Amino acid sequence: MKKTLLFSLAMLLLVNGMAQGQEKKPNIILFLVDDMGWQDTSLPFWNQKTMYNERYETPNMERLARQGMMFTQAYASSISSPTRCSLMTGCNAARHRVTNWTLEKNKSTDGETDVLNLPDWNVNGIAQVSGTDHTFVGTSFVELLRENGYHTIHCGKAHWGAIDTPGENPCHFGFETNICGHAAGGLATYLSEQNYGHDEKGNPTSLMAIPGLEHYWQTGTFATEALTQEALKALDKAKAYNQPFYLYMSHYAIHIPIDKDMRFFEKYKQKGLSDKEAAYASLIEGMDKSLGDIMDWLEKNGEADNTIILFMGDNGGYASGSGWRDEPLFTQNYPLTAGKGSAYEGGIREPMIVAWPHVVKPGTRCDKYLMIEDYYPTILEMAGIKDYHTPQPIDGISFVPLLKQTGDPSDGRSLYWNFPNIWAGEHGPGIAATCTIRQGDWKLIYFYETGKKELYNIPDDISEKHDVAASHPDIVKQLSADLGAYLRSVDAQRPAFKSTGKLVPWPDEVE
């Protein structure tokens, strides 16, 4: 009898131990890079290396790719706020209507156009509670993580709500710790010698001044490094809480101003780059070092085996004018055309890597396409959160089957973009008021101002040099119908003509 009781007790302890092991939730880190081009890395996301892969040094992106899966067709919006609002809400930008970048309350950031009256979009961003005009109300996945036992940390750029609105503060979206996140989508300077945009009395000299880094003022610490050190301190605290953590490491790099990160600048000067391009390269490598520092922390603290890392860019690399990059412009994302703000691939295709120990096969590559709003259901599925309810419909589709190589959620799926806006102060290929659809190999861009439609076969023409709309009218018609139907279904916005006051036709209303 005694032996039977001892055996039963031992089995009970074993079963309980196994159950606890099975219930252990993974830590999750989302490492989002600002304005990073598809080619701003030594890791080739194309089927061949380019001069940019040879130019830049990102050893930790390569390290992460060896541990996980690269995605060669990861898409986002061409501008920061729309991407970040889609990430947080799981909604396409056409639905949430934060279609351009946000900053000041009730103030549009649109540029001017002689032809179009631009729509009254959600200039105040997103919110989790109603009561603020020109916002989209939705529950963030971070709030759902927190409700399900995660310690949630925000570090760096937020940029999903205007000044003096609920969306300005990441803590209103489920983050328990907020490091430097506020309304601004850029930064005044990366330099501690300039107090990251504050005067000697501590007053911000710009709306873009980075808050919360006073400890690093006048220390010679580049902003990317300061944010990394603060993130590591937050992880040290999180480890003591004995609960899984979610870290949103959202760097301001590689956003303008293109300041010199002197830890790496001279290396690139010695490679023969100009001051501007060497500074740009130094921002990239500083970001990569941050990734490596976080990976090192995970290994040192025994958390690497239970931590998922997702790496993503928020929009295309900065390739236009304003004096930040050297000529020739619009080529810096080669083989993709153009960059940030453009409907062409250079504006919307992002570098992406996911490492998930014991789930994702190391050193793999996925050529299926996905969209930024897919992160919402994916991260919740990774965390084992299945039963959740949100006031907003979720447009995103989990890409966990791609990670596990058990299915293809992109099969038969269309991706959609709507940018009924003008990116102020910038001009170049595809930088205009547009709506776009990607379906299989085909991509259709509709220009609101002119009614022009461009059709590209992306696998055959990744640079979008050959518009084949005239030779494939049937495909143009089909994609126009799909795009028009989708935009109507989500109550998307569109401009109107100044000359008549009439709304611009939907793409399926124009031959």
List where the protein language model places each region.
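Long, internal low-complexity/basic segments
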Residues: 22-26, 33, 38, 70, ...
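Short, solvent-exposed turn/loop segments enriched in Gly/Ser/Thr/Pro and often Arg
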Residues: 45, 70-91, 99-106, 154-166, ...
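Short, structured active-site-proximal loop/turn typified by the sulfatase FGly-forming signature C/S-X-P-X-R
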Residues: 49-84, 90-95, 151-153, 173-182, ...
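A short beta-strand-to-alpha-helix junction
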Residues: 52-58, 75-79, 110, 128-139, ...
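Formylglycine-dependent
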Residues: 103-151, 158-243, 251-260, 278-281
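Histidine-centered active-site microenvironments of extracellular/periplasmic hydrolases
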Residues: 166-174, 256-263, 296-359, 371, ...
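C-terminal cap/loop subdomain of S1 sulfatases and analogous C-terminal strand-loop tails that border
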Residues: 177, 182-185, 318-345, 360-364, ...
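A long, amphipathic alpha-helix that forms part
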Residues: 222, 226-239, 266-307
